[in-house]
Amino acid sequence: MALSKEELIEAIENMTVLELSELVKALEERFGVSATAVAAAPAAAGAAGAEAAAAEEEKTEFDVILQDAGAKKIQVIKEVRAATGLGLKEAKALVDEAPNPVKEGLPKEEAEALKAKLEEAGATVELK
């Protein structure tokens, strides 16, 4: 059963950023093409294109930075271990030496979820 153009557009409108990214990758692989912009007018689009690409990257990938462990340091260490898979010694060192990145390059949803877990455990967390 084929989708009409309107149904396809509607389906794309309802996708998350992560789902759209996966769709683009799948289309690139299936058709052997690249979704990078064609440099038809490099002088006009050079700086603006680079700034737009940087802004888009900032919006899709976040670093979770532990600023302070707070009073419940043991709970924060447990959450760091659960999120990163680090051993007890490594997780304790990461928490003791704050500010430190807990995880980097996360999609917005995952970064916000991790931030919420760490803050619930008593930590002060920043997304960059």
UniProtKB/Swiss-Prot annotation:
Entry keywords, A to Z: Ribonucleoprotein, Ribosomal protein
SUPFAM superfamilies registered for this protein in UniProt: ClpS-like, Ribosomal protein L7/12, oligomerisation (N-terminal) domain
Keyword field contains ATP-binding: no
Pfam families in alphabetical order: Ribosomal_L12 (PF00542), Ribosomal_L12_N (PF16320)
GO molecular function: mRNA binding; structural constituent of ribosome
InterPro entries: Ribosomal_bL12 (IPR000206), Ribosomal_bL12_C (IPR013823), Ribosomal_bL12_C/ClpS-like (IPR014719), Ribosomal_bL12_oligo (IPR008932), Ribosomal_bL12_oligo_N_sf (IPR036235)
HAMAP family: Ribosomal_bL12
Family recorded in the similarity comment: Belongs to the bacterial ribosomal protein bL12 family.
PANTHER family (alphabetical): 39S RIBOSOMAL PROTEIN L12, LARGE RIBOSOMAL SUBUNIT PROTEIN BL12M
Name recorded for this polypeptide: Large ribosomal subunit protein bL12
Biological source species: Rubrobacter xylanophilus (strain DSM 9941 / JCM 11954 / NBRC 16129 / PRD-1)
GN (gene name): rplL
